[in-house]
């Protein structure tokens, strides 16, 4: 078994509550899991 901690930055469309956009992104994010950038990696350094 493996535990994975993932962080996503979500920008909801106008009129969409952030928690709904986040839930949709997590669901759909597994299809496009490797959307990663150096900027996002640097932002996650604080969690190490």
Curated annotation (Swiss-Prot):
It is found in: Plastid, Chloroplast. It comes from the Eukaryota. Induction: By water stress. It catalyses: 2 (2R)-3-phosphoglycerate + 2 H(+) = D-ribulose 1,5-bisphosphate + CO2 + H2O; D-ribulose 1,5-bisphosphate + O2 = 2-phosphoglycolate + (2R)-3-phosphoglycerate + 2 H(+). The keyword Manganese does not apply. Belongs to the RuBisCO large chain family. Type I subfamily. This is Ribulose bisphosphate carboxylase large chain. It comes from Pinus pinaster (Maritime pine). The lineage of its organism: Eukaryota, Viridiplantae, Streptophyta, Embryophyta, Tracheophyta.
């Amino acid at each position: 078994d493996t535990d994975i901690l993932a962080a996503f930055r979500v920008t909801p469309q106008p009129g969409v509550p952030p928690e709904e956009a986040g839930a949709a992104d997590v669901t759909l994010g597994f299809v496009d899991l490797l959307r990663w950038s150096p900027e996002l990696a640097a932002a996650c350094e604080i969690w190490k």
